[in-house]
Curated annotation (Swiss-Prot):
UniProt source species: Colwellia psychrerythraea (strain 34H / ATCC BAA-681) (Vibrio psychroerythus)
InterPro entries given in the database record: Hist_DNA-bd, Histone-like_DNA-bd_CS, IHF-like_DNA-bd_dom_sf, IHF_alpha
GO biological process: DNA recombination; positive regulation of metabolic process; regulation of DNA-templated transcription; regulation of translation
Functional note: This protein is one of the two subunits of integration host factor, a specific DNA-binding protein that functions in genetic recombination as well as in transcriptional and translational control.
Gene Ontology CC annotation, any one: cytosol
CDD domains: IHF_A
SMART domains per record: BHL (SM00411)
Name of protein: Integration host factor subunit alpha
Keywords recorded for this protein, A-Z: DNA recombination, DNA-binding, Transcription, Transcription regulation, Translation regulation
Oligomer and partners: Heterodimer of an alpha and a beta chain.
Pfam families per record: Bac_DNA_binding
GO function terms (MF aspect): DNA binding; structural constituent of chromatin
Length: 97
């Protein structure tokens, strides 16, 4: 099962006491801030959680799986996530508190 933005907003509504509208807006603003920071080429560091980075992938050779034709895969930027030590430990230990 995946956690959705709507579910995060619902948790904020239930646990923090924000209105449903404010909770939804807060979640949207949070993710928009991450998007804008990455778009500007900066790293996002969430203490105790992990880091989002942009990585440049160079052009490389590829192949069309249907035709077998060689095609170049163009250079591009990709978003990477590196979990922090606290997150890694909690996931590895199965700790839910």
């Amino acid at each position: 099962m995946a956690l959705t933005k709507a579910e995060v907003a619902e948790h904020l509504f239930e646990k923090v006491g924000l209105s449903k509208r404010d909770a939804k807006d807060m979640v949207e603003i949070f993710f928009e801030e991450i998007r804008e920071t990455l778009e500007s080429g900066d790293q996002v560091k969430l203490s105790g959680f992990g880091n989002f980075d942009l990585r440049l992938k160079s052009e490389r050779p590829g192949r069309n799986p249907k035709t077998g034709e060689d095609i170049p895969i163009s250079a591009r930027k990709v978003v990477t996530f590196r979990p922090g030590q606290k997150l890694k430990s909690r996931v590895e230990d199965g700790n839910s508190d």
